[in-house]
């Protein structure tokens, strides 16, 4: 399944669930006006292509040379490049140098290399029905796993970041709710008949020296995250059934504890 087909398919993914957990109105905002891809995100997409689908990487991204677009030659190059690479992710030459270093170091890391090379499925789209408690209301959940080692019960995800130290990546986990991602993907996978025993994150630095680490998240934390995820899903089911995502924060004065 292509990434575009997956993006267009109906279903609640982690990227929409996280803003919903802030408020239904934030979910609606993200749904109606999704954020534009940043240069860092484009580099991440190119890296995923090189590591997981190298045979079609050239169809996914292209490298644009630095030219002076004020000149006739520069304008001609830019126009031809745009025509030849329509629909692809575009990175620049500096990013390509970083991409090569990231890919090389990822494949030099024993644990990361094993996961990538032994994956039975890569960029695997998964869909499942979530049934709200006490009702017959259902909605579709979706997730796309970077890699699956089906015989070992492993689903893994690749992340790029400036620092892959345990302390800094822990901050990223909290900030971007990678724990919610693990739970959401695990639900989608198990509902699709895929056994999940372990969910490692391959973390690759996008700045020199392009360090690589592989982490799993604390089991006790994930247990608490399951409860948080379930509560959010039940509330989403309520909003989805009523087709009302207008709620935001409390309209009364609230005491803040800290």
Segments from the language model and where they lie:
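Secondary-structure boundary elements
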Residues: 112-116, 149-154, 190-197
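Metal-dependent nuclease catalytic regions and adjoining charged, substrate-binding loops involved
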Residues: 172-179, 184-258
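Metal-dependent nuclease catalytic cores that hydrolyze phosphodiester bonds in DNA/RNA
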Residues: 1-142, 249-255
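Short histidine-centered catalytic/ligand-binding loop motif
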Residues: 34-36, 84-91, 167-177, 218-220
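Coil-to-beta-strand transition motifs
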Residues: 138-142, 149-153, 196, 207-210
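Conserved catalytic cores of phosphodiester-cleaving nucleases, focusing on short active-site segments
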Residues: 143-171
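Short acidic (Asp/Glu) and glycine-rich catalytic loops that position anionic groups and cofactors
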Residues: 25-29, 162-165, 207-211
């Amino acid at each position: 399944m292509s990434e575009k087909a997956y993006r267009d398919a109906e279903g609640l993914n982690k990227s929409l669930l996280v803003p919903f957990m802030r408020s239904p109105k934030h979910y609606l905002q993200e749904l109606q006006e999704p954020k534009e891809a940043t240069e860092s995100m484009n580099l991440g997409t190119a890296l995923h292509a090189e590591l997981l689908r190298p045979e079609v990487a050239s169809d996914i991204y292209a490298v644009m040379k630095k030219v002076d677009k004020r000149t006739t030659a520069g304008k001609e190059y830019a126009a031809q490049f745009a025509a030849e690479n329509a629909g692809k992710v575009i990175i620049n030459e500096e990013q390509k140098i970083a991409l090569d270093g990231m890919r090389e170091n990822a494949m030099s890391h024993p644990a990361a290399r094993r996961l990538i090379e032994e994956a039975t499925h890569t960029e695997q789209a998964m869909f499942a029905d979530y049934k709200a408690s006490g009702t017959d209301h259902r909605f579709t959940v979706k997730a796309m796993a970077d890699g699956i080692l089906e015989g070992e019960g492993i689903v893994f995800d690749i992340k790029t970041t400036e620092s892959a130290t345990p302390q800094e990546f822990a901050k990223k986990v909290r900030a971007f709710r990678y724990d919610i991602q693990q739970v959401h993907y695990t639900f989608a996978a198990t509902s699709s008949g895929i056994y999940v025993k372990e969910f490692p994150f391959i973390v690759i630095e996008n700045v020199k020296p392009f360090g690589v680490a592989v982490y799993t998240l604390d089991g006790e934390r994930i247990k608490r995250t399951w409860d948080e995820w379930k509560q959010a899903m039940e509330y989403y089911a309520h909003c989805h059934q009523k087709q009302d995502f207008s709620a935001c924060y409390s309209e009364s004065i609230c005491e803040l504890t800290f």
